[in-house]
From Swiss-Prot:
Coiled coil: none annotated. Involved in DNA damage repair. Interacts with the DNA polymerase sliding clamp (PCNA) via the PIP (PCNA-interacting peptide) motif. Belongs to the Nre family. InterPro entries: Nre, Nre_C, Nre_N. This is DNA repair protein NreB. Keywords: DNA damage, DNA repair, Metal-binding, Zinc, Zinc-finger. Disulfide bonds: none annotated. A zinc finger (C4-type) spans 3-17. The keyword Transferase does not apply. One of its GO terms (biological process) is DNA repair. It comes from the Archaea. A motif (PIP motif) lies at residues 384-391. The gene is nreB.
C-alpha cells in the first residue's frame, strides 16, 4: 500500500505509521488545567463502540475561538495554526458512544460557538507527544483525565438549540438546517461527532464526522446545481499558498468532479524520490464507493459545489493540488476546504477550449501538465467529447 494513499490510516497493516513519530513536537503542561476551550472536542475511533472522548483545553483563559475554527485560518500562516493546535490539551476518557457522564459534558461543549471555561484534572501528567491525523487538525499533549468541569458558558446559537432539542429531526436534515442558517461547517462537524444530532444519537469518531458532513452537504448542494445551466466558457482558478498549488478547471458541461494530488518528495506522505500523483473522480450521478484520496476529496468537492451554487451554474470540475517539499506536517482536510474557498473567492481566467485552459495551467504548475493529463479521467473524457463534436 502506497503511503500517499494510506496516509497514516494503517491500511498497510503495520502497527505504527513509520511517518508519524518523526512529526511529533515536544509539548508539556501541568497535571491540572483551567482554560478557555474554543470549544473543542475529540472522539476517537479505536475500540468502537467504547472509544476515547476528549475535551480539548488550552492551559490559559481568554478568547480562544480561533484555536478550533478552521474558517478563521485562511489568512493565518500554517506555522501559527500549528501553535494554536499544539496548545490544545486532550483530557482522555474511555466511554460508550451512547451514554455516560463524560459524553454529556462533551455534548454540552459542542453546542457553543464561543469559548467556555473548562477545568480538567488528569490522572497523570500529560504526555509530551502531540496528536496528528490525516483528516483532523493536530492536537497537543494528552493524558487520561479524572474529571472535567464546565465553569462558565454562553448560550448556544438558536439554530443549534433547535436541532438539539428536536429529537425527531434526522441528522442529515439537521446538518442542512444548520448550514443554511450560517452555522460553520466545522461546528456542524463537532455537533455530529458529539452525538447531538439526529434521532438515534450517539458519538461519531471525529474523523468520520468531518468527512460525513463534507460529503452530506456537498451532495445536497450538487443536487441543486444540477438544475442550473452550465457555464459558457472554461474557467481556471489558481492559488499558491504555503508550499501548495491549487488549480481548478471548470468546464462548460454537466456536473462531474475530479480531485487530484501530486505529492513531491520530502512532503507529509511521500518520502520517496519521485513525485506521486493520484486522482479520483465521479460522474453526474455521483459515486457509491469511498474516495481513494480520503477526506480531502470530500472537502474539496464541498468548496467547489459552494462556488457553483453561488454563481447558479453547473460545470465539470477538475481540481488539482500540488504539494511541494517542506510541507511535511499533516494538518487536516480543513486546509483543502478553506484554501479552495479562498481560491474561488478570487479571480479566474476564461478560455474557449480545454487545450487553452491546460496550457494556462502548465504555466503555473511545477509538474508537467502531461503528468496530470495522464492520470486524469475527466480530461481524457473532455478531449474525447470535443473530438466527437468536431467530427
Amino acid at each position: 500500500m502506497d503511503c500517499i494513499e494510506c496516509r497514516g490510516r494503517m491500511l498497510c497493516s503495520r502497527k505504527v505509521c513509520p511517518l508519524m513519530p518523526s512529526l511529533r513536537p515536544q509539548v508539556s503542561v501541568e497535571r491540572d488545567i483551567l482554560g478557555s476551550s474554543p470549544p473543542s472536542v475529540f472522539v476517537g475511533r479505536y475500540g468502537y463502540p467504547k472509544v476515547r472522548i476528549c475535551p480539548a483545553v488550552p492551559p490559559f483563559t481568554g478568547d480562544t475561538k480561533i484555536y478550533d475554527t478552521p474558517e478563521m485560518w485562511r489568512e493565518v500562516p500554517v506555522e501559527r495554526v500549528l501553535e494554536f493546535r499544539y496548545s490544545m490539551i486532550l483530557g482522555q476518557f474511555r466511554a460508550d458512544v451512547r451514554r455516560s457522564k463524560e459524553v454529556e459534558v462533551v455534548q454540552e461543549m459542542s453546542l457553543y460557538d464561543k469559548p467556555i471555561d473548562v477545568e480538567v484534572s488528569f490522572a497523570k501528567p500529560p504526555s509530551v507527544r502531540a496528536f496528528f491525523d490525516d483528516v483532523l487538525p493536530p492536537f497537543g499533549a494528552s493524558a487520561p483525565a479524572k474529571e472535567v468541569i464546565i465553569h462558565s458558558a454562553p448560550r448556544p446559537p438558536k439554530a443549534v438549540e433547535k436541532v438539539y432539542y428536536d429529537t425527531d429531526l434526522r441528522a442529515v436534515e439537521a446538518m442542512s438546517y444548520l448550514y443554511e442558517r450560517g452555522v460553520a461547517v466545522s461546528h456542524i462537524q463537532k455537533l455530529l461527532s458529539a452525538g447531538t444530532l439526529g434521532v438515534k444519537r450517539k458519538l461519531v469518531p471525529t474523523r468520520w464526522a468531518i468527512t460525513a458532513v463534507d460529503d452530506t452537504l456537498s451532495k445536497q448542494i450538487i443536487e441543486e446545481i444540477k438544475q442550473y445551466e452550465t457555464i459558457d466558457r472554461y474557467r481556471v482558478f489558481v492559488l499558491k499558498e504555503s508550499k501548495n498549488l491549487f488549480v481548478a478547471i471548470l468546464c462548460p458541461s454537466p456536473w462531474s468532479y475530479e480531485w487530484g494530488e501530486a505529492w513531491y518528495p520530502d512532503t507529509t506522505w511521500n518520502r520517496t524520490r519521485k513525485v506521486g500523483v493520484l486522482t479520483d473522480s465521479e460522474g453526474f450521478f455521483g459515486r457509491t464507493t469511498y474516495a481513494r484520496l480520503g477526506g480531502c476529496y470530500y472537502s474539496s468537492r464541498l468548496a467547489t459545489a459552494e462556488y457553483l451554487r453561488r454563481i447558479r451554474r453547473q460545470a465539470t470540475a477538475i481540481v488539482w493540488r500540488e504539494i511541494y517539499p517542506g510541507f511535511n506536517v499533516p494538518i487536516g482536510v480543513w486546509f483543502v476546504r478553506e484554501m479552495l474557498r479562498k481560491m474561488y473567492a478570487g479571480k479566474y481566467c476564461e478560455f474557449d477550449t480545454l487545450e487553452d485552459a491546460l496550457r494556462f495551467v502548465d504555466k503555473h504548475s511545477n509538474l508537467d501538465v502531461g503528468r496530470w493529463i495522464e492520470k486524469s479521467t475527466l480530461v481524457k473524457r473532455g478531449r474525447q467529447r470535443t473530438l466527437w463534436e468536431f467530427m
